[in-house]
């Protein structure tokens, strides 16, 4: 009976979206506008409880790269007829002073980088690799997808609006874990390997369109592998395929990304 109720709920809400670039169908119980509104509150909460670095060369670099990737995303989606997917994004980029190799992007374009990952990035191109990957998660609504899955698993047949309005603490917990925001906010619910692979593929295209050489992505992967020393990868990479598989896949997906990159170099 529960499965029937859940199926009916999903159908009634028209809870199916398509991931740009890959074309994969996904479950999305929560409207994008609602996710974006929740992101504003949660993003401000994180920033208020963190040491945010402003005005330094590093902070300015993160902001600059973020703006270029965001512009590339908007350009790509416009070309594909999907400009509406990010029309309500209000991009923000914050650098948080914490020695963890982590970064994330909430719905609506709310991005955070942690200082602990900058050494692995090394330069703007490395930051673009991470930025493109994290923004791709938001564009592909991966967090919304796994939050929807969490609602189905944890709240059963409870109506969505009831779950959100009458169980705000549980909903907030699902939201925070769905976006993998630091351990102090609860256990991270990792992105699936499918999500990570999609974000890698999309991120390559976005960084290429922003004028950053996508061939830097496998190099970043090699530095990340060296950083992990064969142990558990840093938090934001925790559910990626193995380093060797990821690097192989990045190289395999290089063709389309390089096409966009070369166009930017030729002024097209």
Residue ranges with predicted function:
Residues 3, 16-268:
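A Zn2+-metalloprotease active-site environment signal
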Residues 4-12:
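Sec-dependent N-terminal signal peptides
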């Amino acid at each position: 009976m529960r499965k029937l109720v859940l199926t009916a709920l999903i159908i009634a809400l028209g809870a199916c979206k398509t991931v740009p670039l890959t074309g994969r169908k996904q479950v999305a119980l929560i409207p994008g506008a609602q996710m974006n509104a929740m992101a504003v509150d949660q993003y401000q909460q994180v920033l208020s409880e963190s040491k945010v670095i402003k005005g330094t060369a590093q902070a300015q670099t993160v902001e600059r790269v973020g703006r270029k990737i965001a512009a590339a995303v908007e350009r790509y989606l416009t070309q594909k007829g999907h400009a509406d997917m990010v029309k309500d994004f209000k991009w923000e980029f914050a650098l948080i002073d914490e020695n963890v190799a982590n970064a994330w992007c909430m719905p609506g374009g709310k991005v955070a980088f942690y200082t602990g990952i900058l050494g692995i990035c090394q330069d703007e191109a490395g930051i673009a690799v991470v930025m493109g990957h994290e923004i791709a998660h938001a564009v592909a609504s991966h967090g919304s997808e796994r939050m929807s899955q969490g609602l189905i698993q944890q709240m059963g047949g409870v109506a969505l609006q009831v779950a959100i309005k009458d169980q705000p603490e549980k909903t907030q917990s699902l939201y925070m874990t769905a976006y993998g925001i630091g351990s102090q906010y609860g256990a991270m619910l990792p992105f699936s390997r499918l999500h990570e692979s999609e974000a890698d593929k999309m991120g390559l295209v976005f960084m290429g369109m922003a004028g950053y050489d996508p061939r830097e992505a496998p190099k970043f992967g090699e530095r990340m592998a060296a950083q992990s020393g064969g142990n558990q990868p840093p938090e934001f990479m925790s559910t990626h395929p193995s380093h060797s598989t990821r690097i192989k896949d990045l190289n395999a997906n290089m063709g389309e990304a390089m096409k966009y990159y070369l166009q930017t170099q030729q002024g097209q």
